[in-house]
Swiss-Prot record:
Family matches, as InterPro entries: Flavodoxin_fold, Flavoprotein-like_sf, FMN-dep_NADH:Q_OxRdtase_AzoR1, NADH:quinone_OxRdtase_FMN_depd
Gene that encodes the chain: azoR1
Reactions listed under catalytic activity: 2 a quinone + NADH + H(+) = 2 a 1,4-benzosemiquinone + NAD(+); N,N-dimethyl-1,4-phenylenediamine + anthranilate + 2 NAD(+) = 2-(4-dimethylaminophenyl)diazenylbenzoate + 2 NADH + 2 H(+)
Cofactor: FMN
Protein family per UniProt: Belongs to the azoreductase type 1 family.
Protein name in the entry: FMN-dependent NADH:quinone oxidoreductase 1
HAMAP family documented for this protein: Azoreductase_type1
Organism of this sequence: Cupriavidus pinatubonensis (strain JMP 134 / LMG 1197)
Amino acid sequence: MNILQIDSSVLGGHSVSRNLTASVVADLVAANPGAKVTVRDLDQDAPAHLSGHLLPVLGGPKDGLNAAQEAELQRTETWLAEFLAADVLVVGVPQYNFSIPSQLKSWIDRIAQAGRTFKYTENGPVGLAGGKRVIVVSSRGGVRQDANELDLHEKTVDVVFRFLGITDITYVRAHGLAMGPDAREAGLSSARTEIAALNDGGRLAA
């Protein structure tokens, strides 16, 4: 089993999502001895945001790239290879101003490539990255207005992964983290319970 852990929080060791992604991955490894883990820290190694300078890197002929673009091409190919090789992705997705961290969006811009992870057909786009499992660790200071609906940052990653052909998506939520000590502990406790349920149900085993 190849496990890709994606961390995008800017809070380092104080990050709830980072601590929880590490916990999920530890349980995955315990349930799947010999699993290979790749950790991609999008804060410490942040992808550059999409720009005109990057367009030649992400599509079209690769001849004529300058040195900076060649370096970005190699980084992009590394991230794309990690994504394609992963059987399970554990993705830390904190909510920043109603959306996902910009560095996570930049990573998505690198791996969502026509002809590589999806394709266009006469009947619409088709994902090419199916067969993977995604565990999204969702964290936020507040709480969802509707417990039956995905939150805004969750909807973003859900749409992206489904567009790429991935339908096995599970959410671990630590919400209410900025609403006082009791709400914070309740959010953390809920997330721990959800992680334990993944393990109890045998969902962490290959």
